Amino acid sequence: MEISYYEILEITQSADKETIKKAYRKMALKYHPDRNQGDKEAEDKFKLVNEAYEVLSNDEKRAIYDRYGKDALKGGGFGSSSSGFGGFEDLGDIFSSFFGEGFGSSSRRRKSSNDEKIPSDFIVNLKLSFKEAVFGCKKNIDFTYKCSCKTCNGTGAKDGKLQTCPKCQGRGQVGVSQGFITFAQTCPDCQGSGEKASEKCSDCKGLGYNESKDSVELNIPEGIDTGMKLRVNAKGNILKNGTRGDMYVKIIAAEDDTFVRDDDDIYIEFPVFFTQAILGQSIKVPTIRGEATLNLPKGAKDGQRFVLEKEGVKDVHSSRIGNQIVQISIKFPTSLNDEQKELLEKLSESFGIKDGMHQEQKGLFEKIANWFKS
């Protein structure tokens, strides 16, 4: 069964124009190709969303569709317009009508020819071991940066001379049709500038920049963690005017087989023998700095957590130190010798367990038996 235009936009048949427009905006943003590159299913849904909107936003088409169905719209002068929106030049224009100038039309989104071909800043990833991140270290980083080509002044063109891009006619964007809609994409030939080199610069091969290698030693602070960034001043790319941006080092810290880190706190699961849990004993547990004493209370339970204050990680921005949380896992013997078995049987009897049943268990059975009798 073919899905209806109302179902495609997830609205009811009684929806007014404003509701239809809001629904279209939501669905178009969700399935837009720029957000779902390489996703064929999203591309197909995007086409359906636009098809549904073109019909339901037009009173005449909607009336015909409601009365006779989709087939009645084929032919008879009810085909799609050249743009698919009748009055909107491209997707940027309709988004602009919804959201304001931030989305802009193609003419407003053209890049300036004075724009840099390279960003001033860039990011490099740095992998650290668990200990390196927790305690800090020194690291040498080799990196590649870009320098705006002096020969062509960063244009990528021989002698720095550019001409109007023939593909987009200087607009910086080209129209791409998908079903009922024609939307604008950045021109692949000029990358949105509207200008292109007729002859490439021999020094930078038309890129507008040259690459160089460098290295720097970094002091990694104690307590750094995955996702954090360190800024290295004046180690970024070099622009046309000679200014140099910054390099940002993004940290990727490895996990540990024993300790689990959560911000500045450390978690560890530690095995405890059942007699230690019952009697309550002082035990030694490992920490990231060595070991610490944990005083177990009598009758400690499996999975119970205990906090060792200031045995965690130092906060990277202050002198505060996190805690270590120890979760105990109570262990029982899997095999017993004759002497151990005899001792445990005597212990069991001393707790009033006879005929394999404790007094509390007997009481529960009696309670259930009385329940059946009533």
UniProtKB/Swiss-Prot annotation:
It comes from the Bacteria. Keywords: Chaperone, Cytoplasm, DNA replication, Metal-binding, Repeat, Stress response, Zinc, Zinc-finger. One of its GO terms (molecular function) is zinc ion binding. Its cofactor is Zn(2+). CXXCXGXG motif repeats lie at residues 149-156, 165-172, 187-194, 201-208. It is found in: Cytoplasm. One of its GO terms (biological process) is protein refolding. The keyword Metal-binding applies. The keyword Cytoplasm applies. Residues 4-69 form the J domain. Zn(2+) 1 binds at residues 149, 152, 201, 204. Binds 2 Zn(2+) ions per monomer. One of its GO terms (cellular component) is cytoplasm. Pfam families: DnaJ (PF00226), DnaJ_C (PF01556), DnaJ_CXXCXGXG (PF00684). Zn(2+) 2 binds at residues 165, 168, 187, 190. CDD domains: DnaJ, DnaJ_C, DnaJ_zf. Its main location: cytoplasm. InterPro entries: DnaJ, DnaJ_C, DnaJ_domain, DnaJ_domain_CS, HSP40/DnaJ_pept-bd, HSP_DnaJ_Cys-rich_dom, HSP_DnaJ_Cys-rich_dom_sf, J_dom_sf. A zinc finger (CR-type) spans 136-213. Homodimer. The J domain is necessary and sufficient to stimulate DnaK ATPase activity. Zinc center 1 plays an important role in the autonomous, DnaK-independent chaperone activity of DnaJ. Zinc center 2 is essential for interaction with DnaK and for DnaJ activity. Participates actively in the response to hyperosmotic and heat shock by preventing the aggregation of stress-denatured proteins and by disaggregating proteins, also in an autonomous, DnaK-independent fashion. Unfolded proteins bind initially to DnaJ; upon interaction with the DnaJ-bound protein, DnaK hydrolyzes its bound ATP, resulting in the formation of a stable complex. GrpE releases ADP from DnaK; ATP binding to DnaK triggers the release of the substrate protein, thus completing the reaction cycle. Belongs to the DnaJ family. This is Chaperone protein DnaJ. It comes from Campylobacter jejuni subsp. jejuni serotype O:6 (strain 81116 / NCTC 11828).
